[in-house]
Amino acid sequence: MWLLNIHVLQLFLFILIFDPFVREDIDYMEPTLNTPILLYTEQTPNPESLKFVTNKMLYRGTADFRESSFAKDWSPLATALFGFPYVKGVYICNNFVTITKELNFTWEDIMIRLKEFIKKYVDEAGEILKPGFEEEKARVEAEKGIGYQYSGDEEETVNKIKNLIDSYVKPAVEMDGGNIEFKSYDHGIVTVILEGSCSGCPSSTVTLKAGIEGMLKRMIPEVKEVISEMG
């Protein structure tokens, strides 16, 4: 319950402070040859997901791997992590990796081994993502209907929705080791995609309805409902 409250509170803090908000790309300090790689963990609202944070930029973007077969094609790091029997999902963003574990394992038993592995992998400059991943990600998103070109009043509404999600929701969700992406808008229904720790999180429905849907309906009268799909 405490984690759920923190998750919702973080989102409302971004919503209530409604001044113009421009999200700058975070500039992480790139370790030099003499700078040790640091790594620590952060809890997420999803008890099955844990955030592993390092002081090195891993990937300026988002990469969500729910299947080892997709990871094998595009991410050596995710592929290596899927080699552990307790890893169910891998999400890479900026300077952190969110790992979702299988239900029959506890973090107490596996966390230290994962920390040591990720730290060693990053320290040895292991490849995170293969060239061409961005293009493949765009192709997959196009198949899901993401990137559909709206026109007229719908285009204006969709732009407002995207701006609110990118400016107020994404930063809060990212702090919890997850991600949210706009997918579609149809007759007042907004569909978003949840990734990382948000996928399968027990509190995601509360956050979606009490936070995201409430904000969009309040700021954009055309919005009637927000629904989600898992990444």
Question: Locations of the language-model features?
Answer:
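Domain-level signature for proteins that mediate thiol-based redox and metal-cofactor handling
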Residues: 7, 14, 21, 25-231
